[in-house]
Swiss-Prot record:
GO cellular component, one term: nucleolus
Gene from which the chain derives: RLP7
Gene Ontology BP terms: maturation of LSU-rRNA from tricistronic rRNA transcript (SSU-rRNA, 5.8S rRNA, LSU-rRNA)
First-listed, main subcellular location of the protein, grouped into a coarse class: nucleus
Keyword annotations of the record: Nucleus, Ribosome biogenesis, RNA-binding
Family in the record: Belongs to the universal ribosomal protein uL30 family.
Domain of life: Eukaryota
GO MF annotations in UniProt: RNA binding; structural constituent of ribosome
Subcellular location: Nucleus, Nucleolus
Protein name, as recorded: Ribosome biogenesis protein RLP7
Functional summary from the UniProt entry: Involved in the biogenesis of the 60S ribosomal subunit. May act as a specificity factor that binds precursor rRNAs and tethers the enzymes that carry out the early 5' to 3' exonucleolytic reactions that generate the mature rRNAs.
Length: 293
């Protein structure tokens, strides 16, 4: 005797719709992958003007020369042949609409910085040494940020990648806003086959991963980062780099105008210097986080 299908009609309809949705998503992903391959091939065969090649070559050579000067001075400083030369320039908006600059010597004390990756000099390719430093800082993508403890050893590294980053001293409110809104981690839950990237909104995950360090909740992570406590490195590397929003996006005429204004402001705030002892420029990172968070 044949067995009747006892599944309700609604359940069968849901299964059918779920299967159709899954197939449609797979087809859309396949079309996106094919489109990316076509775009990649088109970029490889794209016509490049001679002026663009010359500009890119000159800009890249200037960057290589700058990094060689910075690295050579750092080596002399480690050997004791050169002293001093580590300067910080704090740039703030003035009341009259201009910029105030305050230049101070770095005293070697540990200082908490928030470092944001930005686009480098126009037309220049990133030299290999600068790329290695950016990878070490986990700043492989533009508009990502990490917390860094500035020390005498880290200062030369930030000088190497100065055109590609924006640095500043974050306040406790900015640290809390970043961690609560943008914190992501890689974690493997019980029963999962592999670790997955997830938003950090569970204190149980924090206690499981950092409980041995005395860190059991998100507020403990914020405290360790703000005070640069003993578990600062563990908490910092537990968090993935913060993915920030774009201040200007799109390709409309207004967006292009805003990008030009943004580039002009960046050139005034953070002028690129090819000097070996160029100071490290600090900006109002709290205001920057408020715009991008």
């Amino acid at each position: 005797m044949a067995t009747l299908n006892s599944n309700p009609e609604i359940l069968l309809r849901k299964r059918r719709n779920a299967e159709r949705t899954r197939v449609e998503k797979q087809e859309a992903a396949r079309r996106r992958a094919e489109a990316e391959v076509r775009q990649r091939r088109a970029r490889q065969h794209k016509f490049v003007r001679a002026e663009a090649l010359v500009a890119s070559t000159l800009a890249t050579e200037r960057e290589k020369t700058r990094i060689q000067r910075v690295s050579k001075r750092a080596a002399k400083q480690r050997a004791g042949h050169v002293t001093g030369g580590e300067w910080l320039v704090r740039v703030r908006a003035a009341a009259d609409g201009g910029l105030e600059r305050e230049k101070t010597a770095y005293d070697g004390r540990a200082t908490l910085l928030f470092v944001v990756r930005v686009r480098g000099p126009a037309a220049a390719k990133i030299p290999r040494k600068a790329h290695r430093v950016l990878t070490l800082l986990r700043l492989a993508e533009v508009n990502t940020g990490v917390f860094v403890r500035l020390t005498a050893e880290v200062f030369p590294l930030l000088q190497v990648v100065a055109p590609y980053v924006v640095v500043g001293r974050p306040s406790l409110a900015s640290i809390r806003a970043l961690v609560q809104k943008r914190a992501r981690v890689v974690h493997q839950r019980a029963g999962e086959a592999a670790p997955v990237e997830m938003v950090l909104n569970d204190n149980g995950v924090v206690e499981e991963r950092l409980g041995d360090e005395g860190v059991i909740c998100v507020e403990d992570i914020i405290h360790e980062i703000a005070t640069m406590g003993e578990a600062f490195a563990k908490c910092n590397f537990f968090l993935l780099p913060f993915k920030l929003g774009r201040e200007v996006s799109g390709f409309s005429a207004l967006s292009r105008l805003q990008k030009l204004k943004q580039r002009e402001e960046a050139s005034q705030t953070r002028p690129v210097s090819n000097a070996a002892a160029a100071p490290l420029v600090e900006v109002d990172v709290d205001e920057l986080i408020g715009r991008l968070n």
